[in-house]
UniProtKB/Swiss-Prot annotation:
EC numbers: 5.3.1.9
Source organism of the structure: Klebsiella oxytoca
Entries under InterPro entries matching the protein: G6P_Isomerase (IPR001672), SIS_dom_sf (IPR046348), SIS_PGI_2 (IPR035482)
Cellular localisation: Cytoplasm
Gene3D superfamilies: Glucose-6-phosphate isomerase like protein, domain 1
Role summary: Catalyzes the reversible isomerization of glucose-6-phosphate to fructose-6-phosphate.
Protein name: Glucose-6-phosphate isomerase
Family: Belongs to the GPI family.
Enzyme class: isomerase
Amino acid sequence: KHFSTTAPEKNLPVLLALIGIWYNNFFGAETEAILPYDQYMHRFAAYFQQGNMESNGKYVDRNGNAVDYQTGPIIWGEPGTNGQHAFYQLIHQGTKMVPCDFIAPAITQNPLSDHHPKLLSNFFAQTEALAFGKSREVVEQEYRDQGKDPAALEHVVPFKVFEGNRP
């Protein structure tokens, strides 16, 4: 009902579609990651992939005319914690811009009572890290606070710093 009755400027599906077009055509981001933080949504990325890529994966418009813009991103993803141990390094520190859609339910259907708060903790930590990054100064302070050898710092810092400002 939200999609069909809400004005475009407040319509979440419309806004997400426009952001996707913006990243694809103006930032050259040819891919988009869908990252659900609930195991019951483990196939959501594949579901969304099929709908988006099949609908938008054409080089012509609805009148059959060739277009001169990118028509859709490559959609992929995994449940959050699976992805954290697979491809998040590329998203945080890689050379490619990978816009990400993080999804988490307010109320989970998972019967493990402490599972959802832990997933939400990871969910918020990842989105914050992508938005704000971690500076050299923060990494150095963390090492000092942990009592680690300052001599090892120079070898480690480049691998712990990430810029943030990732969509």
